[in-house]
């Protein structure tokens, strides 16, 4: 017996890199996903995804399409420092709003949050407000912090020196060579996230969010299958 299942993309590389405007490879992939009736969970930081709204809606009519958007920095000036090669957080929040209006469910990735830089209540409140307005299904946080592999650490520190003089030394003194870099305010910020999500009906449990995205819905047949049914 064969059946369609959800396809996930965007976890390791953004499917809407600038070159996608010329190549259209992601759009062709979506055309195949739509043609063969697969579900979709796609993650991006780009508003270029709106170019393919027709395909996202077509996929969602047959099964389920979930768009995941990363929001980490509410302040636009800081966003341009931390994420110089993608559209601003405000624009990504507008994408969430448009997707909501078109009936496409969304999930926000509120990660990474950088200690001593954007790990403030003001920043988290701002991102939560965007998610509340867009009626996102869920918010993924993985705690409040960032992870640093050895190869990434050197590049990260160079950027700290460039944009936040003195911050590298603070990271070294606080975290050494640790892989996991939690915010000193992690506990209080996570309480804020959980409380706000509970008040507004937004899912914040990581396992439940991924179970939702992995669960295949055949809207034409009225049946549901999960990836876990085939493991």
Predicted regions and their residues:
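Conserved AdoMet/S-adenosylmethionine-binding subsite of the radical SAM
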Residues: 4-174, 178-181
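C-terminal accessory extensions appended to soluble enzyme cores
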Residues: 157-231
């Amino acid at each position: 017996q064969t059946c369609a299942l959800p396809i996930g993309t965007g976890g390791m590389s953004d499917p809407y890199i600038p070159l996608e405007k010329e190549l259209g490879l992601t759009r062709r992939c979506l055309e195949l996903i739509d043609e063969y009736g697969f579900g979709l969970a796609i993650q991006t930081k780009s508003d270029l995804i709106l170019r393919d709204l027709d395909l996202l809606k077509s996929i969602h009519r047959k099964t389920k399409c979930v768009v995941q958007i990363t929001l980490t920095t509410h302040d636009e000036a800081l966003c341009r420092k931390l994420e110089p090669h993608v559209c601003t957080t405000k624009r990504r929040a507008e994408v969430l709003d448009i997707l909501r209006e078109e009936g496409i469910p969304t999930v926000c990735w509120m990660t990474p949050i950088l200690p001593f830089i954007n790990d403030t209540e003001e920043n988290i409140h701002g991102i939560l407000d965007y998610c509340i307005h867009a009626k996102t299904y869920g918010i993924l946080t993985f705690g409040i912090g960032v992870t640093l592999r050895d190869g990434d650490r050197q590049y990260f520190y160079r950027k700290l020196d460039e944009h936040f003089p003195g911050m590298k030394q603070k990271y070294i003194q606080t975290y050494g060579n640790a892989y996991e870099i939690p915010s000193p305010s992690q506990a209080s910020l996570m309480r804020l996230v959980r409380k706000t999500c509970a008040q507004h009906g937004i899912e914040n449990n990581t396992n439940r969010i991924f179970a939702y995205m992995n669960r295949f819905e055949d809207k034409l047949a009225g049946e549901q299958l999960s990836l876990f049914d085939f493991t």
